[in-house]
């Protein structure tokens, strides 16, 4: 049976929950067209997160890897276009590490583009009435670290696995502690991720529609 690996993070930065894991764990063992979804939690720690991700890939042998992370302040489902080869942590990770201007992979490429049909995914999620967009930056914290490490692995192994990263907003119960911050219900995010998985599995060539940014 084919499998999809979907990951979320443990809480970080003083939050009591991480919406990525709260949502992702609901998809564990979900069946989609004969494909089984397997959920795994990653530590919010440089290095350790990639170790856990690589172990999960080796174990599950998925055809698709979707890494999900929290982006407090964003209002929609943000599907990442690119990961860059730098760790530049504004805050320490959960193990107290705070790399500044360090490459994720020494002598690795400056960036990798996603292996997901991101515009088709955005279009499908929007058609379901859920806000979504293509994001041009995954940041320089553990989320970007995981996305770059994932795509580097897939590039190095010439693997046909599809892979990429999606950022999601705060949950409403988090947003009450961040006045003015947008949020999205876990129910809406689950629907969006189910659609993202389905579209990524079905589509090999992305939609030719605008998804860029002015700034």
Curated annotation (Swiss-Prot):
<dbReference type="Pfam" id="PF01470">
    <property type="entry name" value="Peptidase_C15"/>
</dbReference>
<dbReference type="InterPro" id="IPR029762">
    <property type="entry name" value="PGP-I_bact-type"/>
</dbReference>
<dbReference type="GO" id="GO:0006508">
    <property type="term" value="P:proteolysis"/>
</dbReference>
<dbReference type="GO" id="GO:0005829">
    <property type="term" value="C:cytosol"/>
</dbReference>
<comment type="subunit">
    <text>Homotetramer.</text>
</comment>
<comment type="similarity">
    <text>Belongs to the peptidase C15 family.</text>
</comment>
<dbReference type="InterPro" id="IPR016125">
    <property type="entry name" value="Peptidase_C15-like"/>
</dbReference>
<comment type="function">
    <text>Removes 5-oxoproline from various penultimate amino acid residues except L-proline.</text>
</comment>
<feature type="active site">
    <location>
        <position position="143"/>
    </location>
</feature>
<feature type="active site">
    <location>
        <position position="167"/>
    </location>
</feature>
<dbReference type="InterPro" id="IPR000816">
    <property type="entry name" value="Peptidase_C15"/>
</dbReference>
<dbReference type="InterPro" id="IPR033694">
    <property type="entry name" value="PGPEP1_Cys_AS"/>
</dbReference>
<keyword id="KW-0963">Cytoplasm</keyword>
<protein>
    <recommendedName>
        <fullName>Pyrrolidone-carboxylate peptidase</fullName>
        <ecNumber>3.4.19.3</ecNumber>
    </recommendedName>
</protein>
<keyword id="KW-0788">Thiol protease</keyword>
<feature type="active site">
    <location>
        <position position="80"/>
    </location>
</feature>
<keyword id="KW-0378">Hydrolase</keyword>
<dbReference type="InterPro" id="IPR036440">
    <property type="entry name" value="Peptidase_C15-like_sf"/>
</dbReference>
<keyword id="KW-0645">Protease</keyword>
<dbReference type="GO" id="GO:0016920">
    <property type="term" value="F:pyroglutamyl-peptidase activity"/>
</dbReference>
<dbReference type="InterPro" id="IPR033693">
    <property type="entry name" value="PGPEP1_Glu_AS"/>
</dbReference>
């Amino acid at each position: 049976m084919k499998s999809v690996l979907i990951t979320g993070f443990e809480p970080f930065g003083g939050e009591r929950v991480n919406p990525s894991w709260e949502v992702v764990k609901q998809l564990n063992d979900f069946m989609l067209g004969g494909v089984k979804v397997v959920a795994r939690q990653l530590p919010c720690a440089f290095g350790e997160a990639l170790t856990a991700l690589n172990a999960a890939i080796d174990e599950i042998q998925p055809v698709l890897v979707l890494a999900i992370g929290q982006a407090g302040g964003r209002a929609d489902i943000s599907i990442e276009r690119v990961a860059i080869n730098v760790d530049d942590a504004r805050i320490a990770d959960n193990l107290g590490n705070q790399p500044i201007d360090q490459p994720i992979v020494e002598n690795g490429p400056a960036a990798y583009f996603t292996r997901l049909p991101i515009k088709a995914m955005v279009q499908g999620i929007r058609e379901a009435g859920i806000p979504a967009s293509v994001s041009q930056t995954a940041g320089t914290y553990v989320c970007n670290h995981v996305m770059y490490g994932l795509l580097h692995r897939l590039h190095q192994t010439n693997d046909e696995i599809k892979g990429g990263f999606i950022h999601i907003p705060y949950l409403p119960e988090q947003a009450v502690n961040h006045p003015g911050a947008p949020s999205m219900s876990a129910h809406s995010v689950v629907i969006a991720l189910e659609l993202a998985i389905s579209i990524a599995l079905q589509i090999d060539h992305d939609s030719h529609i605008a998804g860029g940014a002015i700034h």
